[in-house]
Amino acid sequence: MKAKLLVLLCALSATDADTICIGYHANNSTDTVDTVLEKNVTVTHSVNLLEDSHNGKLCRLKGIAPLQLGKCSIAGWILGNPECESLVSKKSWSYIAETPNSENGTCYPGYFADYEELREQLSSVSSFERFEIFPKERSWPKHNVTRGVTASCSHKGKSSFYRNLLWLTEKNGSYPNLSKSYVNNKEKEVLVLWGVHHPSNIEDQKTIYRKENAYVSVVSSNYNRRFTPEIAERPKVRGQAGRINYYWTLLEPGDTIIFEANGNLIAPWHAFALNRGFGSGIITSNASMDECDTKCQTPQGAINSSLPFQNIHPVTIGECPKYVRSTKLRMVTGLRNIPSIQSRGLFGAIAGFIEGGWTGMIDGWYGYHHQNEQGSGYAADQKSTQNAINGITNKVNSVIEKMNTQFTAVGKEFDELEKRMENLNKKVDDGFLDIWTYNAELLVLLENERTLDFHDSNVKNLYEKVKSQLKNNAKEIGNGCFEFYHKCNNECMESVKNGTYDYPKYSEESKLNREKIDGVKLESMGVYQILAIYSTVASSLVLLVSLGAISFWMCSNGSLQCRICI
């Protein structure tokens, strides 16, 4: 009986078996990502795909300074407003920066035809050659070219006029019919500008042009218009009741433009041979110029980023991330960050069967923890970790490469008569923007889900790799761990980790220990049965003795009468 009780105690006492566990890395990261199924999943590592910062400045784009118009508008610059004289020497630029409320535009009031289209054309120009299309001194010998000035275009307190146009007036009491032509021999597009004067009364018409009825004709291969001055009283603007309407055309190489008029012509003086540049553009911004370089400029400021998306501004110039309306686009590269809970012991129970990661394992994503007579320790599985890193890095780079279509996105211009078209364009742009934002967010959600599943799969594969080696030389204890049926020193542990575990070498020892443990279990069951029988018999005897004693007492005091019949 004593021997059986000893076996029972041995079976119930704890044994320090050698163990090896499969686990994953955890750290103190607070990065969170979203997936298709979950929000704010804490992960060990992630990368941000959304740029949301800028420097608030206008910078050189790829080393080339922008054309900063300052207080001048595109119209004031290209016509040559005297207050924009400092811009005359500018020949090349990376982009054009205009302030929202430019003071110096058309100094003499009037309508600028197709102004928004001209802005669109100039937005793709990175340099031009400014030249005299009709030299002032010799092109108009029968007309006055110096008296055509106005107080509305004053410069330094004196009446003046545009630097790229000439106001032709009568000379010696007459204004002869004129005909002037120019052949484009520049081998590139030439921008030609002119104007038509509309006096406020017939007296001004006669004084300036010496005739009541006049016309202006402009003809090229692609342009053909005849203008008749409209003489009428108008409200004064900048002190002028008259108006000048401004026109322009692009002259193709080899083409000819012909001007004919008998009055009211604001003639071209300088024209522009244009050089197109796909990286150029026009932005409207209050940002100041700074000594800085960038690859991407927005009206808000410069962006120096290689990320595929930005939420700073939809208008961009240069090699820029794509604009989306998102506030967060973060792609997971690591694992779920779930450090083990200390109160549950070292080995918790990712991958559906391991509760927490190991902060102690810092040299890899997946690995092992072992415990034997020589001690315990962590070791990363470098092969699976490196394969995962390579796969995820390639995936992130691929996503960035596919989505990082860097481009210039300039705003579109519409005049006041095109409001319906402008509103429609905004709706179309908003629709595309919504689609891009949805695509970007969905892409990140799907890839995050796949990455976390990928990590789970890798941990499971590592677990199965160990399980297939150990077979019945160890038992699963349900928390990502195996308990050996044999002694496993550090050399043995290393063989399990590197996949060279010698199963036959340890199978005999494991078999004996398994049988011993199974035998202890059977003996334990026998002991339990004997104890149960003894306990039942003893309980019955105690019950019978108690009943006999009670009966004897009751008979002796007359409370119970006993009759024995034979």
Curated annotation (Swiss-Prot):
GO terms for cellular component: host cell plasma membrane; membrane; viral envelope; virion membrane. It is found in: Virion membrane; Host apical cell membrane. Palmitoylated. In natural infection, inactive HA is matured into HA1 and HA2 outside the cell by one or more trypsin-like, arginine-specific endoprotease secreted by the bronchial epithelial cells. One identified protease that may be involved in this process is secreted in lungs by club cells. Disulfide bonds join 21-481, 59-292, 72-84, 107-153, 296-320, 488-492. The chain crosses the membrane at residues 530-550. Keywords: Clathrin- and caveolin-independent endocytosis of virus by host, Clathrin-mediated endocytosis of virus by host, Disulfide bond, Fusion of virus membrane with host endosomal membrane, Fusion of virus membrane with host membrane, Glycoprotein, Hemagglutinin, Host cell membrane, Host membrane, Host-virus interaction, Lipoprotein, Membrane, Palmitate, Signal, Transmembrane, Transmembrane helix, Viral attachment to host cell, Viral envelope protein, Viral penetration into host cytoplasm, Virion, Virus endocytosis by host, Virus entry into host cell. The record marks 344-345 as: Cleavage. Residues 1-17 form the signal peptide. Residues 551-566 are cytoplasmic. A lipid is attached at residues 555, 562, 565 (S-palmitoyl cysteine). Major glycoprotein, comprises over 80% of the envelope proteins present in virus particle. Belongs to the influenza viruses hemagglutinin family. This is Hemagglutinin.
